[in-house]
A protein has these predicted regions:
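Core dinuclear metal-dependent hydrolase active-site scaffold
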Residues: 1-63, 122-153
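Cap/insert and terminal regions of metallo-dependent hydrolase folds
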Residues: 48-125
């Protein structure tokens, strides 16, 4: 569907029974005039490979939110290569119990595509903006405002 000049498209697989509830997640591809953003939800690498086989070039995006908060079961080489992002975002809470993002996922991202990697557990809220003159810009809230309690060990 469209919202002004922005198109939103649901990304999903064949819809067969899911062994893993996370694979029931659907993704969202947001395409704006100067950038695109893929939010894959909590899908596993297996579901990502199905998306790549089905959606192919439509998965291309300038910004990729890593699946499942940077879990080691997600963000496959296949997805990274087809999306080909300039930026990768990790949405994870600071000091979360699951240890997200996993080091092997960060290494996989860096080995597969040359991206700028932002992590909400370190950078705080991340804002995305884009203009014809300045192109795509992402800002980190913690570079703008950092309360004292976040600086504690």
């Amino acid at each position: 569907w469209r919202w002004g000049s922005t198109e939103l498209m649901i990304i999903n697989g064949p819809g067969q029974g899911e062994q893993d509830r996370n694979d029931g997640s659907c993704g969202l591809l947001v395409t704006a005039p100067n950038f695109s953003l893929l939010i894959p939800g909590d899908v596993s690498a297996r579901r990502e490979r199905e998306w790549v086989r089905y959606w192919r070039d439509e998965l291309s995006a300038s910004v990729l939110v890593l699946a499942h908060h940077g879990s080691r079961t997600s963000t496959s080489h296949a997805l990274l290569k087809w999306v080909g992002p300039e930026w990768a975002l990790i949405s994870a809470g600071r000091g979360n119990a699951f240890g997200h993002p996993h080091r092997e996922v960060i290494d996989r991202v860096r080995q597969t595509v040359p991206v700028s990697l932002l992590d909400t557990s370190k950078d705080g809220a991340i804002s995305i903006s884009s203009t014809d003159q300045q192109g795509l810009q992402l800002s980190r809230e913690r570079t703008v405002w950092s309360p004292y309690w976040l600086k504690l060990p």
